[in-house]
Amino acid sequence: MVVQAVSESLKFDQSRFLNDIQILSAAINAPYSESTTKKVLSVFSDSFHDGVVLWRATDRVGDALNYRFYSRRPIDTVTIASSAGLLSPDVVSNLGRLVTSWSSLYDGLPEESCDFDAEKGLVKAWVYMRGMRPLGDILSAEGVPESLKQHEERFKALELEKVRHVAVDYQKATVNLYFRAQGPISLQQATSFNALAGAGPPSQTQFLEMQEFLNAVGYTFAVTIRVDSGDIERVGYYALKLPDRATKNWPVINAQLEKFAQFAPSYDREEMNAVAWSFGGTKRYVKFERSYCGELVPLIKGWGTTLSS
C-alpha cells in the first residue's frame, strides 16, 4: 500500500474542524451536536488525523450533514466503536459482524472506514476491498444473509460483477454494494439499473448530465439493500472529481447544494467535488461530496477509481 505524504498545514486539526462543521451545518440547516461530534473525534482520533476526511450532503433541506474518514491503515472500527459505546451489542452481533466478515476476506487486506452524522454520530462503516473483487466473493462471505445473496444472478445479468467497496448503515440496517459499471452509460442501461429499485428511467435532463459527467470507460454505481427484507431501496450513479467549475459547468444543483458548495471548506491541494444521482421508487435526489483534508484525490486515484476529470 502506498501511503501519501500530507503536509502539516493540510492535516486534520480538531479545533478547525469543530469550527468548520458548526458553520457548515448552520449554513445548510442541518442538525448538529457538538458533544456527539467531540466524542466521535476522540474515539477515532488517529483515523481523522492520519487519514482522509470529506463532507457529504444532499439536495433535501433538513437532511443530515455527513462527514467521513478513509483510513490509511487497517483498523477494526467495529471493536473501536463498540468499546466506546457507539454501537449496541445487538448492532455489533448483526450488522457489525458483516463489516468484520468482509474485512477478513483476502487475508485481512480490506480497510475499514466510517461515516458520521453531524448530529447522531456514527452511522455507517465502509470496507474498501483493496481492488475490484468478484461479486460472488462478497456475497459468499461468512454471515452474509440470503436477503443479499438472492440478488447475485440479477446483478450479474446486468454486468454488475466487480465490487470495490461495501458499506453497512447501522442506523438504517442497509448494505451498499459499490460496483464498477461499464461505460459509457446508455439510457437502456440506466433504465435497467433504476428498475432494480423500482424507479423509472432518469429524466432527459438527468440522463444528459449523467452521460456528460460519468466516466465513459466505467463509473461507480451503488445499490442499497435492506438487510432484513432484501428490498433494493435505491441505486446511485457517482461522478467523482468534477472538473474545475471555473472552466466547465457542473451538473445542475439546487439552492441547498449551492449553499453546501459555498460553505464546505477544503484544505486539500487538489479539491475533489463529486455528485451522485440517486433513484428509489418515486424518490429522486442528488448527493454532493467534497474533500476536506488529508489529500483525497491521490487516495482515490490509488484505488484505480474512474474519475470525471
From Swiss-Prot:
The encoding gene: ptf
Q: Which Pfam families match?
A: PTase_Orf2
What are the GO MF terms of this UniProt record? prenyltransferase activity
What InterPro entries does this protein's entry cite? Aro_prenylTrfase, Prenyltransferase_CloQ, PrenylTrfase-like_sf
What's this chain's function?
A: Prenyltransferase that attaches isoprenoid moieties to carbon atoms of aromatic substrates in an enzyme-catalyzed Friedel-Crafts reaction. Shows specificity for dimethylallyl diphosphate (DMAPP) and does not accept geranyl diphosphate (GPP) or isopentenyl diphosphate (IPP). Prenylates the artificial substrate 2,7-dihydroxynaphthalene (2,7-DHN), as well as dihydrophenazine-1-carboxylic acid and 4-hydroxybenzoic acid at lower levels.
Family (UniProt) = Belongs to the aromatic prenyltransferase family.
Q: What is its EC class?
A: transferase
Q: Which protein, by its recorded name, is this?
A: Aromatic prenyltransferase
- As recorded in UniProt, its EC number(s) are 2.5.1.-
The note filed under miscellaneous reads:
The gene is not located within a recognizable secondary metabolic gene cluster.
Signal peptide start and end residues? none
Lineage top rank: taxon: Eukaryota
List the keywords (alphabetical). Prenyltransferase, Transferase
